Amino acid sequence: MTRSPWKRLLWLKQEYPDNYTDPSFIELRARQKAESNQKSDRKLSEAARAQIRLDFISFYQTILNTSFIYITFTYIYYYGFDPIPPTIFLSFITLIISRTKVDPLLSSFMDVKSSLIITFAMLTLSPVLKSLSKTTASDSIWTLSFWLTLWYIFVISSTKSKDKPSNLSTNILVALVAVLSSRLSTTIDVFCFLLICIQLNIILPTYLSVTNKVVPIISNIIVYSFLNVALGWIYMLLIFFASVFYITVLPKWFIYWKINYHKRDNDLLSTWDARTPILD
């Protein structure tokens, strides 16, 4: 009496031993081993390569935009400069850019409106934050801001819509700014710090694309100039070369891994496993 064909159902009682291996699986594995010994001729399309480079650049630009939060905070908290002039200048630039764009007016208006609501709400709550922060040690503030920063970068990098920040990333940004603003001395400093961070990380990214050549140049000049002043030119050069390595070399390594290893590792699962659930 012939046995029924083996099925890939672990919960089904079958007339096969527990260590049974299907012959088709063995043939597939042998064929893949033979192919792995040959020179790989798989290639990625130019569009796929360009998308990989763009993803690396987008993440790098996200790091730059996030670093503006700490640059602004250091400008106000450590150096004690007046935050009103840069706030007015940045607000003027934001207003000009928003008027020159041809995006739907209603959507842009809603983005600005929601950001302003958050700003004035935080301005109202800033005295409360100041009173609460008196009982909080600075080490706790720095630790909390560090983890909020990592969380913010992770969320905004994994957002599918790159032209509009998600609600979660906006809330994390507001929480991060609220934590840092508790160290500032006056309500005006808190308001200006919050307004600058919201414009740089919420409003302006909705208008400016990462492919814009002017924005990355200005961002890099500001960030590396600040690093030169704050850390010195040696550390600035180390960070600069690490950034160049990340933008130029790592994408090539990732493309090489994508061509030679990634598909090969997933061939077995994608071919053998069912694409849709198999029911009894």
Swiss-Prot record:
Residues 1-53, 97-108, 157-189, 242-280 are cytoplasmic. GO terms for biological process: fungal-type cell wall organization; GPI anchor biosynthetic process. GO terms for molecular function: phosphatidylinositol N-acetylglucosaminyltransferase activity. It is found in: Membrane. Keywords: Glycosyltransferase, GPI-anchor biosynthesis, Membrane, Transferase, Transmembrane, Transmembrane helix. One of its GO terms (cellular component) is glycosylphosphatidylinositol-N-acetylglucosaminyltransferase (GPI-GnT) complex. It catalyses: a 1,2-diacyl-sn-glycero-3-phospho-(1D-myo-inositol) + UDP-N-acetyl-alpha-D-glucosamine = a 6-(N-acetyl-alpha-D-glucosaminyl)-1-(1,2-diacyl-sn-glycero-3-phospho)-1D-myo-inositol + UDP + H(+). The chain crosses the membrane at residues 54-74, 76-96, 109-129, 136-156, 190-210, 221-241. Signal peptide: none annotated. Residues 75, 130-135, 211-220 are extracellular. Its EC number is 2.4.1.198. Pathway: Glycolipid biosynthesis; glycosylphosphatidylinositol-anchor biosynthesis. It is a multi-pass membrane protein. The keyword Glycosyltransferase applies. Belongs to the PIGC family. Part of the complex catalyzing the transfer of N-acetylglucosamine from UDP-N-acetylglucosamine to phosphatidylinositol, the first step of GPI biosynthesis. Component of the phosphatidylinositol N-acetylglucosaminyltransferase (GPI-GlcNAc transferase) complex composed of at least GPI1, GPI2, GPI3, GPI15, GPI19 and ERI1. Interacts with ERI1. This is Phosphatidylinositol N-acetylglucosaminyltransferase GPI2 subunit. It comes from Saccharomyces cerevisiae (strain ATCC 204508 / S288c) (Baker's yeast). The lineage of its organism: Eukaryota, Fungi, Dikarya, Ascomycota, Saccharomycotina.
